Amino acid sequence: VSIDCSGYPKPACTLEFFPLCGSDNQTYSNKCAFCNAAVEKNVTLNHIGEC
């Protein structure tokens, strides 16, 4: 499973809830929050859903 993070980071994210579990074992609330972290901290996707 991969998430396309082209166009990130963004300055603000919506409050949409679509949890994604990152390789840092942190649950990100949605694609925007995950992609911001992926770009800034080189986090990858472990799986869709909470960690």
UniProtKB/Swiss-Prot annotation:
Q: Which GO terms describe its molecular function?
A: serine-type endopeptidase inhibitor activity
Question: Which InterPro entries does this entry report, sorted A to Z?
Answer: Bifunctional_prot_inhibitor, Kazal_dom, Kazal_dom_sf, Prot_inh_Kazal-m
**Taking every annotated instance into account, which residue ranges of this chain make up the domain Kazal-like?**
3-51
Q: Report disulfide bridges, numbered on this chain.
A: C5-C35, C13-C32, C21-C51
Q: Where is this site: Reactive bond 3?
A: L15, E16
One GO cellular component, as annotated: extracellular region
Can you name this protein? Ovomucoid
